Amino acid sequence: MTDLTEKNTALEEEKIESAVENQQKSIWKEIFAQGIWKNNPAVVQLLGLCPLLAVSSTATNALGLGLATMLVLTCTNTVISLFRQYIPKEIRIPIYVMIIATTVTAVQLLMNAYTYTLYQSLGIFIPLIVTNCIIIGRAEAFASKNSLLHSIWDGFSMGLGMALSLTILGALREIIGQGTIFEGIENLFGEQAKFLTHHIYHTDSSFLLFILPPGAFIGLGLLLAIKNRIDNIKK
């Protein structure tokens, strides 16, 4: 009788452990899905439209700013989650901005040192990451209320979602506007990355509409339409 009771207890403990493990896995998957698709900063929340529309004239510029944003999001979420218990609620927003500004300054200096041509191309939009609603939004909505590891994963997922949206929009505009993709990628990853540059078609003149700001709005509209169509099909 005692052996049977012990076996039942062991089975119950295994079930509980398995349920907890499955719950943890589902949390990680849900955070990732929120950042990449369900709550994508660019095509769902429509945040950070200023750099999204201004810098996405080429895939290289878009990818560069996307990676910078992802790095800033991950780092700021990490710091804010780590010190969330010590940040006074009354002055949390100025503290968040100070942490974000410090991180952006570090990223800006790194880009100035190692990817100078891209740094010049992105210009004012690197320091403007400080005012990006995505960064402060994740700090307030997630990092200040959740564990360190979950906050790091949220920052990475949201940043990756933003970087993917930027790069896809940049690639779309570059292909239609100039007939190339990843032109100047060596400015971001070095000469060894030149193989990524492709000429889709050759033209004597560029399609200016897609290179200029109107093309950014048209391209973003297309991405929104495609995403909404996919969501409707899934339903």
Swiss-Prot record:
Membrane topology: Multi-pass membrane protein
Pfam families on file: Rnf-Nqr (PF02508)
A GO term from the CC aspect: plasma membrane
TM region(s), chain numbering: 63-83, 93-113, 117-137, 152-172, 206-226
Localization per record: Cell inner membrane
GO terms, biological process: electron transport chain
Assigned keywords, A-Z: Cell inner membrane, Cell membrane, Electron transport, Membrane, Translocase, Transmembrane, Transmembrane helix, Transport
Coarse class of the protein's main subcellular location: membrane
The EC number(s) this enzyme carries: 7.-.-.-
Keyword Isomerase tagged: no
Domain of life per record: Bacteria
Assembly, per entry: The complex is composed of six subunits: RnfA, RnfB, RnfC, RnfD, RnfE and RnfG.
Stated family: Belongs to the NqrDE/RnfAE family.
Job of this protein: Part of a membrane-bound complex that couples electron transfer with translocation of ions across the membrane.
The protein's name in its UniProt record: Ion-translocating oxidoreductase complex subunit E
Underlying gene: rnfE
